[in-house]
A protein has these predicted regions:
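Ribokinase/PfkB-type carbohydrate-kinase core domain
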Residues: 1-48, 53-98, 160, 166-175
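Conserved post-catalytic alpha-helical subdomain immediately downstream of the catalytic base
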Residues: 71, 75, 79-84, 101-169
């Protein structure tokens, strides 16, 4: 969808920001060969960017999560959330910086875990949760997604995600 890359996406994000709409961007592999700067025009209009570690390394040409986050922040992104699979999630903005651990699950299929994370993260932000809570909630959704075969059959409800989080906390306290 070349019309949504570069200037096309930037015009959509710019219009959204002008109306006061929060903007979120998940990244994907560079299927069209547009290069790391191919979507850089959206960065000044992006409140939250949520690349996987591999996507972030490609875009920033850096390997250190801190340096990667700085790359996005220096270009105008509000908050950088780097999804790192079983290693957790690195988060940075102008006032916060933290690493959030992943939930330990027996992974059956990781297809769609990043999408589950992003959807849950957006939902949590729109529900007014704090940033660390948003990340934990999103991580829980991603972890639940990994426990079944398929990209979109595991995460069914907010109460399921919250129950998973409570159970994980209980198990951690028992150790």
């Amino acid at each position: 969808l070349k019309k949504l890359d570069g200037a096309g996406a930037a015009s959509i994000f710019k219009a959204a920001k002008a109306k006061g709409v929060l903007t979120f961007a998940d990244m994907t592999a560079d299927a069209y060969g547009i290069g790391p700067e191919g979507v850089a025009e959206i960065y000044p209009y992006t409140d939250y960017i949520m690349p996987s570690y591999e996507e972030a390394v490609y875009a920033a040409r850096e390997e250190d999560p801190d340096a990667i986050a700085d790359y996005f922040l220096e270009r105008g992104v509000g908050t950088c959330v780097i999804k790192m699979g079983s290693r957790g999630c690195f988060v940075k903005n102008r006032s916060q910086r933290f690493m959030s651990e992943a939930f330990a699950v027996k992974a059956v299929d990781t297809t769609g875990c990043g999408d589950a994370f992003c959807g849950a993260f957006i939902s949590a932000v729109l529900d007014g949760m704090g940033l660390e809570e948003c990340v934990r909630y999103a991580s829980a959704a991603g972890a639940i997604n990994a426990t079944v075969l398929g990209a979109h059959t595991a995460v069914k409800s907010d109460s399921q995600v919250r129950g998973f989080m409570e159970e994980a906390l209980k198990n951690t306290e028992e150790r």
